[in-house]
Amino acid sequence: MRLLSRIKYFLFLSLFLFSSCEEELESEALVFAEDVIFVSGEILRITGRVVSSGTVTITDHGFQISESPEFSSPIIISLGERSIPGRFIGSYGELSTGTDFFVRAFLITKGETSVSEAIEFSTLDPELIDYAPVFEEAGQTITINGKNLTVDSEVFFGSQRATITEFNNEAEIKVRAPNPAVGEYSVSVRVITDGKENVFDKNFEYIIGKWQLDSNYPGDPGFSRNVYFQHEGKLYSGMEDAGTAVQLFWTYDISTKTWQKKDFNGPYVVYPGVYNGGFLGGTDTNSIVKNFWTLDQSGNFIAEADVPFRLVQSVSFKVGDDLYVFGGQNEFGANNNSIRKYNFVSKEWIVLGTMPIVTSSRFPSFNLGNQMYFLTVSNDLWKYDANTSQWEQMASYPGATGAIGGGTIGDFGYVGLGNNSREMFEYDFVLDSWKRKTIIPGFNNDLTLGWFTTDDEIFVLRKPSRGTGASKLYKFEPFNF
């Protein structure tokens, strides 16, 4: 059909070239559909041509588009009046994707409509290429790349519809990630175009975690160092140093959200090794002490026999009836690399070996039973298996250096709030991988002076780095939104 149309066009043109130019009568005109020069999911661009030996009065010309060759109820591309022969271009941008169409040129002269032979074409189906980022907070911009995407496309994150903020050239859609439905934190990303649904292979994952202010801390607002630990559902913070040593603790009852003063009948100490239920070692600012403190079920401090070593800033884990003590510094200021274990039943200490790393309470640590994890100054993560006495290097921590604290909830470890950072990270024990969580309120340079972990929540004590603003206790729920 296209070949026959072109033959007619050239024959008609040849007739005009060899015809007499002496007459001034208005010429006859023919119209041809030439080439489909562009087609996508919803856009068609096509050229046509009016052929005439002279001027001609055309009241309208353009193209007709239809899904049927009979052109019943066609889409009209009207290009208006015309008086001279030549090429013309038409465009239409609201076609259905993945559909077969017919297009033909037309002109109207002397009240009569002439049409060309039809050209058949097909619009393209929408395709998805990728999207980024694949891990982000709700409300942030997500960019979707594809082909033949239409302006009326809809984007869904799981069951939630996203708001489209920008559409570019059928190839890019920018959306705001919607708030997730309850429990839907790893969701498919679907793009619906003309009723056709395309789904990305990789799920989108929300950065989740809920921070909220739980209480204001009643201690001295000017303190810069303290001793903190937890015991039987209560949080302990004390031994504050704000220029003058404070020889007491504040206890926080999580269930009632109340603080109470707790007298301490021992000497003032800083930088001890702390664990869930007490602390040991440290310094009284003049020398390293060998004190060892536990708490009974009523929360009273009990002085155990002195430890057989002198350490500050050691790392301690209580697992069952055993207390493991790692690293720290000795009385000469040198890094200690010993691993010790104390049994609360036999009251005996033993040395288990040495560590291949340098660690202290200045660096984050956490444990999953007898498997203990340590971050180094360079953010390397090491695991110690107390059952086998083996060390293994794991996935490096991706956050800022200088992070503190550390805790375990379920199958995940938590570390964060490094130097000038409000980021919290979650470590997956099974996958050996890190994932960012929601940032804590406040300022990047706020100081973290306490970290406590319960069965399903983390409590963090934060204070401004400058001035004497009150410290605040924040609660973090890692699986909430």
Regions found by a protein language model. Name each.
Residues Y92-G93, G98, I144, I164-T165, ...:
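Hydrophobic core positions of the immunoglobulin-like beta-sandwich fold
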Residues A245-Q247, K257, I288-K290, N335-N337, ...:
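Repetitive beta-architecture junctions, highlighting loop-to-beta-strand starts
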Residues I37, G48, I129-N145, E154-V155, ...:
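An edge-strand/N-cap motif at the start of beta-rich repeat modules
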Residues Y252-K257, L295-G299, Y342-K347, D385-S389, ...:
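Short loop/turn segments that connect beta-strands within beta-propeller blades
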